[in-house]
C-alpha cells in the first residue's frame, strides 16, 4: 500500500516517523535546531519547556548567536525512547512562543 502525501506537499505523520526511524537510532539522542530572537525570555521559555518535556531524561542546549547578535541558534539534543517521542517533543518545542525556524 502506498502512502499518499497531503496535497500541500507536506509529509504525513507516518511518513515523518518512517524517515526518523530510518535515520536515527532509538532509544538515543535526537537533535533539534531552533532559531529565535536573542532574548532572555525565549531562553527561559525554552529551558522550562525542555525541563517539562524531558523530565528525568537528559538534554543539552548549545547556543550560537548570529553575526549581528539579533538571532540565536539553539542546538538541542534530547534523549528519547522512540521516533514517536522524538516527533512529539519536536512538535511541542516548535509551539514555544518565539520560535522562528525549526530544523
Q: What is the meaning of each model-derived region?
A:
Residues 1-73, 79-103:
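Long, contiguous binding/interaction regions
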